[in-house]
Amino acid sequence: MKDLSSAEIRQMFLDFFASKGHEVVPSKNLIPQDDPTLLWINSGVATLKKYFDGTVVPNNPRITNSQKAIRTNDIENVGKTARHHTLFEMMGNFSIGDYFKEQAIPWAWELLTSPEWYGLDAEKLYVTVYPKDQEARKIWEEKTSLPDGHIYEVEDNFWDIGEGPSGPDSEIFFDRGSSFQDLPDDDPEMYPGGENERYLEIWNLVFSQFNHLPGLTDNSQYPELPHKNIDTGMGLERVVSVFQNGRTNFDTDLFLPIIRATEKLSNQFTYDDSQDSEVNTSFKVIADHIRAITFAIGDGALPSNEGRGYVIRRLLRRAVLHGQKLGIKGQFLTNLVPIVGDIMESYYPEVKANTAKIQKTVAAEEKRFNATLTGGLSLLNDVIKEAKKTGQTQISGADAFKLSDTYGFPLELTQEQAEDAGLTVDVDRYNDELQAQRVRARAARSNTKSMGVQNAVLTDLRVDSKYVGWSQTEVNHAEIVAIIGEDEQGVDALLDNADVDATVQVAFDVTPFYAEMGGQVPDFGDVLNTNGDVIAHVTDVQTAPNGQHIHTVDVISSFTLGDKVDLKVDMARHIAVSKNHTATHMLDQSLRNVLGGDVHQAGSLVEPEYLRFDFNNEGPVSSEDLDKIESMMNQEIAKNLPVTWLETDIESAKKLGAVAVFGEKYGDQVRVVSIGDFNKEFDGGTHANSTAELGLFKIVSESGIGAGVRRIEAVTGLQALSQYKAQEKALKEIATALKAQKLTDAPEKVYDLQADLRTVQRHAESLEAKLANATAGEIFNDVKTVNGHTYITAQLQVSGMDGLRQVADNWKENYPSDVLVLATVADEKVSLIVAAAPDANQSGIKAGELIKSIAPHIGGGGGGRPDMAQAGGKKPAGIPDAFAAVSAFLADK
């Protein structure tokens, strides 16, 4: 088998299909663009959906990619199985109505077996087909050199996810050999396609040839599609494990550098790929999660309490907890980010380029979580005290969930602390609470953000609704023309009434509420009855498939279809959003003025508190250019330029010099917003009346979110002033701490401190080395003998595992004994190291085996190589017993 790196395997896949006329599409951002139904890009085909559903016709119907993706539905299995990941890459080739099985199957075989490409042994390849897909079976038999008996018919080989395209598929398996076999030969699962470790699925070819129409349940009744498609997926991590003979996906060049770096950070435990253990699980979880965290933050997602941000936060917290299990103290994940960048640099250079920004975000979140752990422990202690006071033996699931959901305190830690206090946790009730939250989250994601796709009631809604928010923020005597909510069966339906405390969707014949669009968040506000009483709060506004503004409202007082109501927009929010939207247009223009006319918008978000603007640019924007952009913005703000708008036809708008947002689609009539003579753009949002209303503009950050795409986050008005004040305060505090007379003296003080620190560090290292040499001279004379084997045991006062290693290195210079066992204690934690001489190894004494037999005495575990192993524990009193166990171990050798 060829010796290929992960980078070579990926590139070879893309090169092969490029040679077959495919367009190589770069891996897209993990954050879906214009697809609110997805939290993350979760498959190789997800970014190509617009081609498969016919929304967009590709320039080339043949496409290939290697797409990064995130899935977290099985997060609990990560590290416990061989192939579960949160971040993974899916390589694929796709045909949009072009070639079909006759070419897809032979090409797959050529890539896998040709010496020019992967060169896998044909005898080790097996395929499965759908029993009714004899066409595919015949192609495998006649158009490839697949050995006889290597085709299995499997009923599950039919890809069908509901209404729409569907079809049979062929899965390709690689026989890893008897050393990977985990089931008896006669086990019903011991075949390609069964649940076993020997036959590994490496590629799935989906033949999308049928149309699953509504009401049909038997796939034999599905009509054929007029244009058939090919959709294949090869998991990079899986196929790399084949070429690199990894026992799991983690035992490859995609993960091992991260694991090795984590071993060094642990200083107590080592990863042993020959077995499954809790220690190995922790190494794997950390390696998996830091990859996902690094890529997600690099693509623009940030830790938060909801949506994508919550996924990042959860992954990071799980990784931190597993780091603690490995004895890692303090912040450590930030040290692993550059390693991810190095591993993936060949295909994702932007990750390495954004390392500093990603590290900063990770470090801040780690610090926040460490504070959470401290605060959570205090709250948990109160819960434990109350439970004991009332004679309970269990912490309620509701309390455990509250600690987790509200305060971010993980269930695992709650269980650990409860056990120490002699209590248990009601995990079943906790899971009930968690499931209820997931149901709420799914409902929230599906109600309005994806209404154009999911809600048939809205699709059929034909009532008229006029938006007047460009010129007014209040409307009197608006009529309620539609109420949408759950009927008695829990199904969305048109209702006649809205009851108190319900959350429903409402359409009015005329509305001042802006619907979320073009990156601008929606207006909030109130619905009032004719007496002026608030009867509902508007909490969201979206555009329905037929253009109506659909208002999500929390009902305070019941109302009825046809009622006349007054509508009032929350002015504070509206004004803040409008100012930031105007700033977004000005920033767009300033970027083009400073960086060049080739710069175009790649996305935006306009919130009340801040604005975010994405744009194309190769490489980071220099600090000098950022200063120019910021200065230009504030100069134009100071000019008090008027902000005006007009509606006209698209050709007239272009003649006026209005700029269209790249990638947006426009109708015949467009709205043009002008900011004096500074900027003209097509736009449908709300704006300030003049630039002076913005007050001040401040760039908060500039970063990369993908290949060739940069992001600026900025604030205006009082938010900008607060930024300046916060920076000034921080500088003053730094100057005070440094005892600098003036702020301008602070940098020189920092340089002096750095020089002093380097001097102290060198001195400390010198003292450590001298201490190790002195200690070694004392203990190497105390040699004991048992069963003809010599050994030394000693408890030392050195600086943790590094100090023990220093002494062990001195011991290796002349091997005064067959075995060396050293221990030290710091903060009630034991570090233990075992070294075995080459002669001892030859006589069957392995350091890794010895440490596993003695580590339980110190309340811990460990492992390592035959010549060197280490362990950690929480029981210093057990050190004498551990040393005594050395003699017993050697007596049996």
From Swiss-Prot:
Its EC number is 6.1.1.7. Belongs to the class-II aminoacyl-tRNA synthetase family. Consists of three domains; the N-terminal catalytic domain, the editing domain and the C-terminal C-Ala domain. The editing domain removes incorrectly charged amino acids, while the C-Ala domain, along with tRNA(Ala), serves as a bridge to cooperatively bring together the editing and aminoacylation centers thus stimulating deacylation of misacylated tRNAs. One of its GO terms (biological process) is alanyl-tRNA aminoacylation. Keywords: Aminoacyl-tRNA synthetase, ATP-binding, Cytoplasm, Ligase, Nucleotide-binding, Protein biosynthesis, RNA-binding, tRNA-binding. Its main location: cytoplasm. PROSITE patterns: AA_TRNA_LIGASE_II_ALA. GO terms for molecular function: alanine-tRNA ligase activity; aminoacyl-tRNA deacylase activity; ATP binding; catalytic activity, acting on a protein; transferase activity; tRNA binding. It is found in: Cytoplasm. NCBIfam families: alaS (TIGR00344). It catalyses: tRNA(Ala) + L-alanine + ATP = L-alanyl-tRNA(Ala) + AMP + diphosphate. This is Alanine--tRNA ligase. Catalyzes the attachment of alanine to tRNA(Ala) in a two-step reaction: alanine is first activated by ATP to form Ala-AMP and then transferred to the acceptor end of tRNA(Ala). Also edits incorrectly charged Ser-tRNA(Ala) and Gly-tRNA(Ala) via its editing domain. Signal peptide: none annotated. The keyword Cytoplasm applies. It holds the Pfam family DHHA1. One of its GO terms (cellular component) is cytosol.
